[in-house]
Amino acid sequence: MADNDRLLSIIERITDPRINLTDKNTIDPDGLPLPALTNVGMGTVFEELLRRFNEENNEEAGEHFTPRDAISLLAHLVFEPVKEDLPKIITLYDPACGSGGMLTESREYLLDLGVRSAAIQLSGTEINPETYAICKSDLIIKGVDPSGIHWGNTITDNSFSDKSFGYMITNPPYDKSWKEDKKKIYHEKMLLDHRFELTLTNYIGEEEVLDSTPRTSDGQLLFLLEEVDKMKPLEFQPQGSRIASIHNGSSLFTGDAGSGESNIRRYLIEKDLVEAIIQLPNNIFYNTGISTYVWMLTNKKKDNRKGKVQLIDASQAFEKLRKNQGSRNCTIEPYRTDILRVYTDFVEQEANEELKVGSKIFDDDDFRYYNVTIECPLRLRCQFNSLKIDEMLYDSSDIEVSKWLYNTYKDRVFSGLDSEIPAIKEYLNDQEIKITDKKLNKLISAKAWKDRQRLMNAAKVLMKDIGTDVYMDYNLFSTKVNATAKELKLETSAAELKTICRAMSVTDSKATPVVKKEHKANSKDVVMLLETYGVPEDKLSDYGYHLVKKGMYVEFESDSELRDSEKIPVKEDIYDYFQREVRPYVEDAWINLTQTKIGCEISFNKYFYKPTPLRSLKENERDIIALDEQSQGYIKSLFELM
């Protein structure tokens, strides 16, 4: 407050003789009585100011002041299962502590259990200076040492790098960009922060150290990695560390296999850190109505929980408030005991009108899947065509602009258009065409225009010699073009001749597959499939290598337009799935096994979805009759006319 010139005005305000903040009744300068401010009154005022301040201050997406009933639930979830075996010193950490509610509520819970105040150490980080000041003030008011609260950025500043904690509770911001933060933890493309690097195995069991940062539009899972990084090793705390972290739905399923989000989920599941995930009711926060989920993590699971994850659906476990508080219109307080019971008992149960909390238990592998790429061969019909040859003059990356350049500047494109850049940019701006300077320089490059003109002229010479016959086999067409170019002594490279062939080709499902490469049986690609991936020799064709004669395989080029991917549960064999779900419908498909990635996602809708039963014919008939009575027989008369 002193740094921001606020301290003096605050002191003047609280010492105003017209305000009574003491515990004794008094009289103001005008002789009017000023009642004492009781402890209860002070607490009520403070909570209301906190709520209002946070509603106004948490304007950015994903920043939410956590209500007390949610904090209380998290405190119980963290400590209830281990309350009989707490360590002598309890270290509690919140990497996004806000106004400190998570920490102080957990402290109150521990005090109620009989834990000594001196045995509780609170730590936290908060990026917002005003909220940080409120957190420190709250702790001071409560007589708690505030030195463990740091002002800083949890993502960029690993301020507790030399510490670990036994218990962590947080509600980090979600759907909030961390684009600027990312620049500070990278040197060019190299990640500098070990917290966000994870060691995972690939499909063939090789360990890889992966950059597992999520997309820059949402950094919530980085806070979860921060907490995992700060877990106390079992040799320092045999009871293990426990984490309760609130996130929105994107933490469960956003990101394809191999993405940062998916890798984070994989790591947590494969390391068997996830005890449970609990879906909370909507509209329990003050400024958002989104679905939220509590991730419960520990590095010391009970034996019956090992290799398992419990999903708890508490979305219907709420009681409506008499009056809305912003977006908040309900409380989970009356159902806290039910949620705790289902969690601590580790039982499955169906939610219904009487039991508002549902629970299902899964194996860790139920959430992991193989993302398998399925390929189909590229089939091309080939024919020399004057129109296609003329099109070769233009840049294929932006034919329309390239055509405009040629139509406007004619043969000047071959000598350079640098002097015309301002006029070209003005045209592009008028047409609302957005092109980077790098791409524009490529489009006006005199060398590129000359190279394309040379290829176009070569194609005309080839067409004159080869003719316009249709080839349904690209391989024969390519062989013919290469042989003719050699006979005519055209100064064209193999890559340029391939460009000409492709320009004269279109996809055709009836054409012969395009051969990419021929392989001997001892080639590294074939050996890798046989030995590293364990593919049986008689099934190589299902993996893209077709036997054409003894000791020789042919590999077809894949058609990117027909490429597909399949999510196959890790409990299922990829080949069996392919034979059952793909082969019957696409005869020439194959598995691109080397591109296989392992992903992880958790879908509450999938596991707890309850379809709405269809209405019976009797119910529909009854409603139609009722409507007919309201319309004085009009509906019935329509049916009589039919």
How would you describe each model-predicted region?
Residues 1-54:
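Long recognition/docking surfaces used for binding and targeting
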Residues 35-39, 60-68, 210-217:
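Short acidic-aromatic active-site loops that bind/stabilize oxyanions
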Residues 1, 23-33, 57-65, 360, ...:
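Short coil/turn segments at secondary-structure boundaries
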Residues 51-58, 203-208:
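Short glycine/proline-rich turn/loop motifs
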Residues 4-8, 12, 39-43, 47, ...:
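Non-catalytic, well-ordered alpha-helical scaffold segments
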Residues 60, 64-170, 174-190, 248-250, ...:
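Conserved S-adenosyl-L-methionine
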Residues 15, 46-54, 75-79, 107-108, ...:
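Amphipathic, well-packed alpha-helical segments that form the structural scaffold of globular domains
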Residues 162, 167-636:
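A conserved structural/catalytic subdomain of Rossmann-like adenosyl-cofactor enzymes
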